[in-house]
Regions:
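Short intrinsically disordered terminal tails
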Residues: 1-4, 52, 115-133
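Short terminal alpha-helical segments
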Residues: 8-30, 41, 59-67
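Short amphipathic alpha-helical heptad-repeat segments
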Residues: 55-64, 79-82
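Charged, low-complexity interaction regions
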Residues: 69-80, 94-98
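Short, charged, amphipathic alpha-helical segments
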Residues: 80-87, 102-106
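Amphipathic alpha-helical coiled-coil segments
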Residues: 88-101, 116
Length: 133
């Protein structure tokens, strides 16, 4: 298994597009692993700050990260994994009432449809369904 990572400069640009404040970007960078210009999530990432608790910003950070993972994916499996991450954030944003992030992901999904051909987040990207006996 490989550790999921993205190109740091691309992630920085994506975080700006998602409107993540600089102090949140710095906190995320401090809690992530950086090596050879690539950023990977810490295996047990946890926001232990007392003052940086805005769910909108943390959801935006994670959406930006997984959109970069999708963009850099080199296999169908990696694309499916990234889409699953984006889907999870989409439904988490909805459950937390963070409509802005839900709407931004919905727009991203619509814009990238020609690449992934999945009509909506509630549709599976898996092409071979498991058979249960």
């Amino acid at each position: 298994m490989t550790i999921i990572s993205v190109e740091g400069k691309s992630l920085g640009a994506e975080l700006a597009v998602w409107g993540v404040p600089h102090n949140y970007v710095l906190a995320f960078a401090e809690k992530s692993t950086s090596k050879n210009g690539r950023i990977s999530l810490h295996p047990f990432f946890f926001n232990d700050t007392e003052h940086m608790t805005n769910p909108r910003h943390w959801l935006a950070i994670n959406a930006a990260f997984w959109c970069c993972v999708y963009r850099e994916a080199e296999s169908k499996e990696a694309q499916i994994e990234a889409l699953a991450g984006i889907r999870a954030i989409f439904y988490t944003a909805g459950a937390l009432g963070v409509g802005e992030i839900k709407a931004l992901i919905q727009e991203w999904w619509r814009t990238t449809y020609e690449l992934h051909l999945i009509p909506a987040p509630n549709h599976s990207a898996v092409t071979t369904q498991p058979a249960f006996h």
